[in-house]
Amino acid sequence: RDVLGSRGLGDVYKRQVVGNRYNDRFYPTISGVARSLNFYPIGNEKAEDGIANIALGLGKYIVDGGQTLRFSPRHPHNILQMSTMDFALRETQTRFYALDLKNMAETFSVDDAFNLVKLGLKDADAEGSLKYIVSTYDPYDQIIRDGYYPGGRKILSFVNILQHDVFPLADTLDQILRIGQQEMGRPVEIEFAVNMDPSDHTRATFYLLQIRPIVDNKEIMDEDLSLVKNEETILSSTSVLGLSLIHI
């Protein structure tokens, strides 16, 4: 940050973009958002186990509601989207954002995406950025193989990271979320990125971009529902979507 306040000009903030350069494009191996509280746990997951959503490329893809891979940092092997072949083929990321290094702005723009380009996985494949983060669909044997293989459709499963611990992403997220919640005294949300060296998977860097408390009151409920008497309950269920209060 360059502070110009002494001259009455305000502050100018500079934020480095995380990523690798691929010809005229620049993007990280992984962008992600994680929360220390998961309101939609699946199977043996618990709310306090947290939740993460990750994708290839710049984080704008996640912010814009793009298809991501969802997992709990404490249960990285339980990936619902990879539970069946049809589900994996349907619920996988097919596009991503990259910084267009050829698009040099001559003036400042209020459009934060003016120098971004939206690409397909074939572009990333040609640039060699999928090697450690995909599975490959074999149409002849009708199976999905862990890892990158020539030919076949590529599925962004991040299998080598979540299943085979090429990079300890799940454990790193779990520790950061736990410490962040402990220090802030409430559930937290983080934004992060991971860069992997395309030529050496043992060289990877984790970047913690932002951490902030979750302040949405609709998602924070201190009520002890076990104290509510059955005769005072209008409707109850053991399977619900998140927490909320309705005042009548």
What are these regions (language model features)?
Residues 23-46, 52-53:
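Conserved catalytic micro-motifs used in adenylation/nucleotidyl-transfer and phosphoryl/amide-
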Residues 2-13, 246-247:
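Single conserved hydrophobic/aromatic residue that forms the stacking wall/gate
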Residues 206-208, 212-244:
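Metal-dependent catalytic core segments for phosphate chemistry
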Residues 28-33, 69-73, 223-229:
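Short intrinsically disordered coil segments
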Residues 16-21, 56-60, 162, 194-198, ...:
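Short, flexible loop/turn elements at secondary-structure junctions
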Residues 186-213:
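Conserved metal-phosphate-binding beta-hairpin within the catalytic cores
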Residues 23-28, 64-68, 199-207, 220-223:
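Short acidic, glycine/serine/threonine-rich loops at helix termini
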Residues 48-173, 177-183, 187, 194-195, ...:
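Conserved catalytic alpha/beta cores of large enzymes that bind or transform nucleotide phosphates
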